[in-house]
Amino acid sequence: MTTIRGNIPSPNNANVVLTNVPCDSTVYVGAAVRMTLVGVAVNALADSAENANVLGIVEFKATSTLCNIRVLGVTEKIFTGLDVTKTLFLSPTVPGGLATVPPTSVGQVMVPLGQPFSATEMLVFKRDSVIRG
């Protein structure tokens, strides 16, 4: 068994990354994305159930309209300043954004997306969403 950082098992066996996915030009590395009906990744937003249906986190953009999306596992070192004591949620105000505080307004959707693994990496997992009512 391969380990990283002491005795923590390597997460390589639990990695799911979708490669060369068509994406909107506004999508950026580190963004939480959802898929449109025509199969294009767009920035997700916790303002409605439809917009908050997150597929994963963009890890790489080969072109302005082609990206790799992490669905499960530890991301590449694409972030800065993550706090390992905080759960990350989908932002209700910044398209594709991550927040350390869950949305609380009526109609917004609480979507837990993952846990920082280090200051630069995130363990991506998607839990059930909760629509605030």
For the regions a language model picked out, list residue spans one by one.
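Glycine-anchored, exposed beta-strand/edge motif detector
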Residues: T2-G133
